[in-house]
Design a protein with these regions (language model features):
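N-terminal organellar transit peptides
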Residues: 1-135, 140-141, 154-157, 172-325
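Pocket-flanking alpha-helical
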Residues: 145
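Hydrophobic/aromatic residues within transmembrane alpha-helices
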Residues: 148-149, 256
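Zinc-dependent metallopeptidase catalytic helix centered on the HExxH motif
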Residues: 152-170
Length: 325
């Protein structure tokens, strides 16, 4: 096929014949471009709106909610598998207290207790919270779990929940007889007679038992006095009835209510409705869950790390001596 010859329109100038397709593309808008831009703009606007709702509105107190913080598991000084770390829990309390959109705080408790120090740390932190705060005991809020509850302004409990157990305990493990049977021996070099108190490799002697008993009673007295301080204002509280349960017995929620250790019996929803009305949000308040923001891997590694740390601590320092409230 012959190739069209290019025409010269002047000296040194060559004109190319314009193709119909090129002219058509110039005259007709490209389909899909404007629509794509609109979708992109909508996505950007949506992201900005979500950012505004999640970050800016709470910071200026628009709307309102009650902050729900779960205390679920054994109370310890640091987080681990099945435990609640007091340090992180206190941070959650402070975060809720500093948010203008959180009008009140409810601690939802399901804990058998735990570390004396950790329980008291959370109790002390609750006393510094400025907002209205209540506790709800669901399945269990015993011992250290109840210690935490008395730091709030009002205690709800399910009638069938387990609470009470006001006391302290030190646990010692003795495997010396097993070692004798298996022919295993252990030698301890120590600077003082009681440096290895709590060791599992021999029975505790009389002086060690007396010392530990004094510490346990000191912790118990502090626990008891704290309960009297925080609960004596309840109209049902009776010191005579209270003395009867100081053998560290567990109580049902209903039994605790009858002697003034709990303010009201009810469900989780009723506790939230009570707090909602108390802070002016009505019986169906919006819920803001205050919780640690961690991924699965970080939580797993933290649990493993604390487990190793606890094992080393027990083996090198306090061995198997554990004080629980």
């Amino acid at each position: 096929m012959a190739v069209p010859r290019r025409k010269a329109s002047g000296a040194g100038e060559i004109n190319y014949p314009a193709s119909e397709e090129t002219e058509s593309q110039r005259m007709t808008p490209k389909k899909g471009v404007d629509g794509g831009k609109i979708i992109l703009y909508l996505i950007i606007a949506l992201v900005a709106a979500l950012f505004l709702m999640n970050f800016l509105l709470p910071s200026i107190g628009v709307g309102g909610c009650i902050g729900v913080i779960a205390l679920d598991g054994e109370i310890a000084t640091s987080d681990g598998y099945g435990t609640v770390g007091s340090e992180n829990f206190v941070e959650l309390l402070q975060r809720a207290d500093s948010r203008p959109d959180v009008k009140g705080i409810i601690i939802e408790i399901n804990s058998p207790g735990g570390s004396v120090v950790a329980s008291r740390e959370i109790y002390s932190a609750l006393l510094k919270i400025n907002k209205t705060k209540i506790a709800y005991i669901s399945e269990m809020g015993a011992s250290g779990g109840y210690y935490v509850a008395v730091g709030t302004d009002y205690i709800f409990a399910d009638p069938a929940s387990i609470t009470g157990s006001i006391g302290a305990v030190a646990t010692l493990l003795d495997i010396s007889q097993l070692m004798n049977k298996t022919g295993i021996s252990e030698t301890t070099i120590k600077s003082g007679a009681m440096k290895d108190i709590g060791t599992m490799y021999r029975p505790a002697n009389e002086n060690e038992t007396m010392l530990l008993n004094a510490i346990v009673n000191e912790i118990f007295t502090d626990f008891k006095d704290t309960v009297v301080l925080e609960r004596s204002g309840n109209e049902r509280f009776s010191n005579t009835k209270f003395q009867e349960v100081l053998d560290a017995r567990i109580l049902s929620g209903k039994q605790a209510y009858n002697i003034g250790l709990v303010d009201q019996l009810g469900t989780r929803q009723e506790a939230r409705a009570y707090l909602g009305e108390a802070v002016g949000l009505g019986k169906n308040p919006q819920i803001c869950r205050i919780q640690a923001e961690r991924g699965f891997l970080s939580s797993l590694m933290e649990s493993i790390g604390h487990g190793i740390g606890d094992t080393l601590t027990k083996g090198i320092d306090v061995q198997n001596l554990r004080l629980f409230s």
